[in-house]
């Protein structure tokens, strides 16, 4: 027991040292903010954040043996950076709402709890918030591994001049939530149609006699469950904390490989980090082999394409545009050359942005 007592003393000493260093970091962040403000420099620099994350992950693994989990380290440093940044300026983030949805969760994972968040009713509203500079950033869903692409997000890039400034990939884990503390009390289950579709087998097997009801969002389902102990909601863990609901059953989604990718949008371009993606859209001429000739450019320059999607151009029937994600930054020599060639082989080319790849997804 004496050894336990001494170890706890050592933990107390370390905690005090961590607290001292956090306050030192906060003071430095405030000073940096003052310098940036005087020089009219952007307060938030995502490229610098990426550099910090990569450094601490590398040090944790290579120098300290990786005893502390990498994913937990990312979450901790996200909040440290978010809190320090808020001392310089409160970052304003618009997202597809309402609160406690997966888009809200993605935004929190990217910007931390110290940012100021504005939920929006539609994807278009998120774009408008960024375009009008009412928000510094926006967060919108773009694709799910089961449900596919979010077409409305892609369509917005056809008409908007905002840039892609980041991506977030999160696992979609669904839970049965309720104000009751027993699953036996649940008589109705509410959720968004997509969430219900993704856990249909579990519901049929475990709650075969329960009525399943679609509502406009997982957040609305939680609001109903909060008021009625006989109601259950299918939603995220963030929703459980937000609405103070009990988690009656965890991970009820039918597939374990359920991920959603979100895009961060902004008004400015980002500098290369060395681990980037570039997103573009282009239209080809209505002639045989036009798409082949366009895509051949990337093969020629040894550039890997991670995604390609087609969407109607909305200009005339059977006219399509192509959305492509590729590895590399637009300022890299080979990417720059490829995009220059591509412009000559297409009707139009629009670079949507170059941005760091999602952390821990490389």
UniProtKB/Swiss-Prot annotation:
List the InterPro entries hit by this protein, alphabetically: ACT-like_dom_sf, ACT_dom, Chor_mutase/pphenate_deHydtase, Chorismate_II_sf, CM_dom_sf, CM_II_prokaryot, Preph_deHydtase, Preph_deHydtase_CS
Q: Might you give the EC number(s) for this enzyme?
A: 5.4.99.5, 4.2.1.51
Record GO terms (molecular function) = chorismate mutase activity; prephenate dehydratase activity
Q: What is its main location?
A: cytoplasm
Question: What is its pathway?
Answer: Amino-acid biosynthesis; L-phenylalanine biosynthesis; phenylpyruvate from prephenate: step 1/1; Metabolic intermediate biosynthesis; prephenate biosynthesis; prephenate from chorismate: step 1/1
S-S bridge residues: none
Catalytic activity annotated for this protein? chorismate = prephenate; prephenate + H(+) = 3-phenylpyruvate + CO2 + H2O
Residue limits of the Chorismate mutase domain? Answer: 1-92
Any one GO CC term of this protein is:
cytoplasm
Q: Which residues does substrate bind?
A: 8, 25, 36, 49
Keywords, A to Z? Amino-acid biosynthesis, Aromatic amino acid biosynthesis, Cytoplasm, Isomerase, Lyase, Multifunctional enzyme, Phenylalanine biosynthesis
Report the domain of life of the source organism: Bacteria
- ACT domain ranges (all copies): 279-356
**The keyword ATP-binding is annotated on this UniProt entry:** no
Q: Cite the Prephenate dehydratase domain residue spans from the record.
A: 93-267
The protein's location, in the record's own words, is: Cytoplasm
Offer one example of a GO biological process linked to this entry: L-phenylalanine biosynthetic process
In this chain's numbering, which residues are marked as the site (Essential for prephenate dehydratase activity)?
Answer: 260
Purpose of the protein: Catalyzes the Claisen rearrangement of chorismate to prephenate and the decarboxylation/dehydration of prephenate to phenylpyruvate.
Q: What is this protein called?
A: Bifunctional chorismate mutase/prephenate dehydratase
Question: The organism's lineage?
Answer: Bacteria, Pseudomonadati, Aquificota, Aquificia, Aquificales
Q: Which gene encodes it?
A: pheA
């Amino acid at each position: 027991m004496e050894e336990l007592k001494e170890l706890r003393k050592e933990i107390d000493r370390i905690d005090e040292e961590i607290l001292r260093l956090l306050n030192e970091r906060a003071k430095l962040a405030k000073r940096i903010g003052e310098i940036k403000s005087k020089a009219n420099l952007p307060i938030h620099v995502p490229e610098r954040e990426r550099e910090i994350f990569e450094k601490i992950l590398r040090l944790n693994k290579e120098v300290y043996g990786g005893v502390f989990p990498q994913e937990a380290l990312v979450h901790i440093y996200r909040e440290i950076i978010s809190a320090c940044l808020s001392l310089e300026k409160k970052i304003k983030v618009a997202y597809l709402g309402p609160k406690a949805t997966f888009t809200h969760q993605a935004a929190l994972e990217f910007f931390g709890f110290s940012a100021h968040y504005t939920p929006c009713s539609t994807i278009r509203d998120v774009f408008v918030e960024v375009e009008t500079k009412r928000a510094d950033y926006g967060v919108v869903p773009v694709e799910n591994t089961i449900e596919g692409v979010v077409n409305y997000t892609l369509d917005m890039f056809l008409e908007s001049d905002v840039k892609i400034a980041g991506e977030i990939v999160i696992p979609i884990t669904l839970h049965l939530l309720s104000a009751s503390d027993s699953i036996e009390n649940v008589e109705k289950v509410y959720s968004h149609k997509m969430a219900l579709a993704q856990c249909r087998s579990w519901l049929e097997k475990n709650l075969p006699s329960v009525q399943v009801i679609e509502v406009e969002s997982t957040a609305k389902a939680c609001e109903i469950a909060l008021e009625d102990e006989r109601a259950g909601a299918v939603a995220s863990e963030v929703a459980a904390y937000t609405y103070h609901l009990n988690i009656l059953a965890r991970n009820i989604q039918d597939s374990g490989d359920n991920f959603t990718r979100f895009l961060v949008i902004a008004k400015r371009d980002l500098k290369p980090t060395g681990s980037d993606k570039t997103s573009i859209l282009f239209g080809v001429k209505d002639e045989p082999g036009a798409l082949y000739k366009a895509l051949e450019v990337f093969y020629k320059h040894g550039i890997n394409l991670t995604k390609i999607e087609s969407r109607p151009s909305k200009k005339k029937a059977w006219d399509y545009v192509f959305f492509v994600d590729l590895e590399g930054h637009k300022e890299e020599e080979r990417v720059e050359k490829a995009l220059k060639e591509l412009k000559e082989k297409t009707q139009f080319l629009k670079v949507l942005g170059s941005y760091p790849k999602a952390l821990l997804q490389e």
